[in-house]
Amino acid sequence: YIDTYVENIRDIVPFLHNNRYVDKVEEKMEVAEKEGKSKYTYLSDLEVIYHFVHLQKDMDEKKNRKADTKKSYISEILSFCQCMVQHAEEFELNGEEVQKKDSLLKTLQPWHIRKYNSWLKQVENGRNGETYAVATLAKKAVLIRSFLKHLHVFAYIEKPLHEELQRANVNEQDRPNRDLSYDEVMKILGFYKERGHLVNYTILLSLASTGARIQELCTTRVKDLHYDGKYWLKVTGKGDKVRELFISEYLYQCICEMRRRRGFQTVLDRGDESPLFVNQRGNFYNSKTLSNQVTDMIKKTNLEFLQYRENPVTAHTFRHAFAIMAVEQGNADLYHLMQTLGHENIQTTKIYLEKHMKRKNNVGTSFADMLV
């Protein structure tokens, strides 16, 4: 039975992604309420996962979970369930009990969560076959804890299982080194410029010179680009917050040439809904696909400084590079940098500069080279 449970989960993924069934699930909840029972009485495991993922907490639709966030939630929760099933013997999970209750989630006990916790810390599912990074553990723990707490609040499970899941606090030393200097950025850009690879060059230049998130660039349309003494690009960031990115004259020309080579003219038109950054098929780039492509672009340069880095240079690394260059080359203050990057909290902006500033302010750099 426990094996068919996993198969059923895999088959039902399209259902979990579709928000059309919210009303039907809530009708079942209403029936239970009218009978004086808890809301989740008549729901199955999959339905409670569905309701948790699609739960609307705000009357303003823009403030509720976005599609990508929902996908991430579904993926993590299903991984949690599949882990429980695949390691049932190790976790001492009783398959007969699961069948009797027709529910995995209602069968879970505190010791199952503690064993899952130990497994999560040791499993080699991370980058390069290593254990998960602390930041990844923190993300998984926060999400599963939130889900288990939700099940307890809605009385689907009796025990507060979320209290058994250990926290994974991310300290400064746990964060990957995403610093990238001006010289390193120029070496990467120079590699593709010298080889005349305009598309790769334009994408990397766009990331480095605007500080944009890759998803922001992938969703921009021609109508979002306008000229007001300088070129400005309107992007929609996290939380649907809109801000403008400065586009240099040189970057604008590169974007125009990239579009021209792919069969598109660039006329600033507020009614043009077509993508600004067009892929080979003339469509919007998929942000995850492009993000992977950017990582590959960097690897293929085989630049010497990349061999000594602990972590690969990714699209996100260029946001850190932008922050460092803004402070080093442009003397930007923290508040203006926060606004430009679209950070909600200035602490996030500080994290971007943390390692760089500690190295820059290390007093040893002022005299140690003289000790020869």
Predicted regions and their residues:
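N-terminal core-binding DNA-recognition domain of tyrosine recombinases/integrases
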Residues: 50-69, 75-175
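Long, amphipathic, Lys/Arg-enriched alpha-helical "connector/arm" segment
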Residues: 118, 172-198, 220
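Flexible interdomain linker/hinge and immediately adjacent N-terminus
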Residues: 156-187, 236, 278-283
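Basic, Lys/Arg- and aromatic-enriched nucleic-acid-binding interface segment
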Residues: 186-214, 241
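Short, polar N-cap/turn motifs at the start of nucleic acid-interacting alpha helices
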Residues: 226-227, 286, 331-353
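Catalytic-site neighborhood detector that most strongly recognizes the C-terminal catalytic loop/helix
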Residues: 239, 341-366
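Active-site/catalytic core of tyrosine-dependent DNA strand-transfer enzymes
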Residues: 249-308
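Short, basic (Lys/Arg/His-rich) helix/loop patches that form interaction surfaces
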Residues: 292-339
